[in-house]
């Protein structure tokens, strides 16, 4: 098929999530209102570290992907697909990283649509992910572990383990 793997990163992904229940927090240090030190802030958006943040982000991106015509597979969460004119597009969501493969024209269009809704960084073709190096050729893709620095410069002794 010759499908390439593309990678995008959603900047400040959790801040895109909307908190559906009432959540309050103390005023942040440095932003305390004089004479109202005991007041708290009601959150409208998710913050990093908030236990509801991953769920709020996932709900937000899931809704948007559905609006774009994606369907989530029943076999695996965070794996989406869509087919337009017999041209497939597959999207994998991993926290704040998106991976796309399929028809190149559809990938380009999808990247534009995602960037309109979320602040994104297009990382282009995937080269690294979760400690794996990804090599992509015209009709093949290889995964391999990334050697640590000692392995690369030949200083690691097998007996050190």
Where are the predicted features?
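Long, low-complexity, charge-biased intrinsically disordered regions
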Residues: 1-161
């Amino acid at each position: 098929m010759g499908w390439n793997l593309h990678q995008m990163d959603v900047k400040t992904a959790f801040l895109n999530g909307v908190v559906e229940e009432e959540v309050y927090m103390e005023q942040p240090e440095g932003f305390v209102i004089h004479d109202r030190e005991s007041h708290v802030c009601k959150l409208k958006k998710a913050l990093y570290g908030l236990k509801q943040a991953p769920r709020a982000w996932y709900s937000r991106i899931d809704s948007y992907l559905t609006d774009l015509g994606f369907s989530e597979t029943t076999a695996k969460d965070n794996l989406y697909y869509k087919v337009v004119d017999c041209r497939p597009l597959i999207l994998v969501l991993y926290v704040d990283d998106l991976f796309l493969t399929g028809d190149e024209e559809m990938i380009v269009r999808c990247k534009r649509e995602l960037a309109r809704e979320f602040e994104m960084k297009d990382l282009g073709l995937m080269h690294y992910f979760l400690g794996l190096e990804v090599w992509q050729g015209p009709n093949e893709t290889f995964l391999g572990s990334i050697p640590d620095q000692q392995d690369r410069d030949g200083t690691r002794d097998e007996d050190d383990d």
